[in-house]
């Protein structure tokens, strides 16, 4: 089921910054990017998060965009991941997968319950303006694409097709 064009589900999760983060509160300032990631062990997740870490300050400073990576792991594992990959963004803990379920869904893997990798760009009114759910764990939207998408009034650089 696609969420593109629909209202995003609100959520509040604990972050690696030691605070709770609520989606609706970030939307008060500007668009928000929600990334659903599989776990601290996922190299594809780390690669994607690094691309968003590289553009996060630029998006926040120039466009008031927040990046919210939701990962189906406890905060302790996410803190290790953040430090290991030198990420400049906070990670949000969704250990029971309840938020991932509202977005891209979850699946049982050899690592336990994991979120299905996905990227969402949510406008200030809560509307999902972009959705990409991975067909394969390596299938990811990168930070530069999202920056282009937001700065060009949510226009897909590859056209509508």
Model feature map: region roles:
Residues 1-161:
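Chalcogenol-based redox active-site neighborhoods
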